[in-house]
Structures are given as C-alpha cells and as structure tokens.
Amino acid sequence: SIDLFNSIPNITNLNNVLRYSKDDGNSWVNIELDTGSYELSAISNEIQRLMANNGDYDQNADNPYFITITANLSELKSIVHISNENYKIDFSVPNSIGSVLGFTNEIIGKGYNESPNIINIIQVNSILVNLDIISGSYVNGSASPTIYSFYPNVSPGYKIVERPSPSLVFYPVSRNEINSMRVWLTDQNNDSIDLRGEQITVRICIREVKNVKRDIVRAIKTLKQDEVL
C-alpha cells in the first residue's frame, strides 16, 4: 500500500511563463506562475491575480479581468477569452504555459480563442512504485524494478490512499539476504516524480515461498545429525 498527498506539480519553471501585451503588441510583459499543482481554474485565477498585481485590470467593470481561461470539456481543449481589444498573448516564448493549455506558437487577441490541441494539464498519467530487491517485473516489454503502478485519481492537495486491487502480486526477491531496500517513484516515462518534500508511506509485503521437497530433505539431514535416523 502507499499513502501520500497529491503534491505532484504540473506547473514548473519549464512551463510557467505567460507573455501578454496591453498595447496591441508594442510592448510585452512576462508573468511567471509559481511551481505547483494547478487545475485549469486555478491557472486562470493565478494569472488574473498576477496581472492585477501589475495594475492590468479594470476595477470598475463587472468582470475586472481582461483574460479568463476556461475548458471546452467536450473536446478537452482550453478557451482563452480576452475582453480588451488592446490585449494579446504570445505563446511562442520559451517555457510558455501555452504547452499546458494546448497552444503552440500562436499570438492571440481579443475574443474567444480555443486551443488547437488538447490540454496537457496532467503531466503524470501513471505513478510507478519501484523496489530494488525484486525481479520478474516488466513495463512496456522491458525488465523493470516496478512492483506496482497506479493513477493519481484525486485532485491536487488531496491525499492518495492506494491499495492493491483486486489482490497482491508477488515478485521473486533478487537477494538471499535483505538488509535494506530502496523504494522510489517514477512516472510513465521513467522520470523521477517531484513530491516537493511531502512524506510518503509505503508498505511492502514479503512472504516465504514454501518448497516442500527442500524442507523434507533438510528435516532428514537434521534428524540424521541428531542420530534419530
């Protein structure tokens, strides 16, 4: 079993930049979201907060924010609505958040802007639990130390409580003696998962494989040594 909080970030310094212009592209401003686990609505809220910090909002309007991001749930795309005709967004900059929102190198302006691609807000599709004392496990046809895998099915910030279902799967132990073992988590690409300092609890079950023939031979040898036979 494994217990941990879903603190896996989908926004890092590799995809956290939003570049926008408030004067029809004559000058540009970059804002950066902090590393974290964001849902689409949280991305929109954080962008609006950062823009408001820059003074780029209309406090007298019913909706004071010039940029709002929502989802097209039927097509799994994002919608970026820009309400001010002088505002533009440039997704072509390095480390742009556009890669998360389904945009590539577009520059978009006022109105309804739907991403050409499906959003990529879930960076980790599968969590692999790896253990350095097993053998006989394979992932995508290659030998692997993976003892278990699962999908993080809770929202960011919530606790993941994962139990093997329907039953435990046992793998051969690759050592004769176990003095220590190493457990680590990777994603579907075998990249290490950043838990951002969160504690993780893993429970490993090890059982002895009975070998009746071997046990009988050992018993006979013991009895002979004790001169019972």
Please place each PLM-identified region on the residue numbering.
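The ATP-binding site of the protein kinase catalytic domain
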Residues: 1-229
